[in-house]
Amino acid sequence: MVKGTPGIVNLEGPVSERLPNRDHLLLWNAPAALAELSGLNVRIAGIANNHSLDAGAVGAEQTIEALRNHGILPAGGTAGAAVLEFNGLVIAVTAHDLTQGVPVNLEADLAAARQHSAVLIATFHITGPASFLPRPKLRHAVEIAYHAGANVIVAHGTHALGPVERRPHAVIAWGLGNVAFACDCTQEEDAMILRVVVGSDKVVSAEALPLRAGLNNRPARPSPEAAAIFDLLEAIGSSPLQRKGTSAFF
């Protein structure tokens, strides 16, 4: 991340201690991880995903409180939209889980978030086998977000990359992969960071930065195969890329 620039992540699972009597806890984040995220200037964490209730409803509420105590705004679930003011712009960030389908209240949620913000960032969590191509329900949700005025639309959850796309008032990243993930459920190492510069109701620039995901306690690194990642993105239907070494603008 650029120093001083706020970061947005999906936090997969609750913040919780692993206790002997909580065998049902499938995926969780150690409380100490929040200080690390805060140190990286992560300002917003989406908490709407298929593991958000792994510590139960109480665990989900405790996660919201823990994030706020570390200066990180939660987005999604009972927290609703996160609203951040940065460089004079009011930025709203929403997070929705599509595991059970497109939420019936999605359009209303996005309209409410857009009403009082200069920039709307809509994020979606989608589950299923790793695939470079977006699933129908993700396409449906993205179209709703675009027509609701979202300027940046991002999907995550299948552990796989997806195309990047530029439209008149928005950019779309159809799949980011993972930055860091300690789970035997995936071995997908290709990932990317989306870096955007925004103005009021517009995206000034959008840049894809390929990563090698930090899986199972290995650190995330810039991808040594950035050119191959760009080839892949173009092959699966991305908007034209302007390559600049290890990053590409679109």
Model-derived features: where do they sit?
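Acidic, metal/ion-coordinating pockets
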Residues: M1-F250
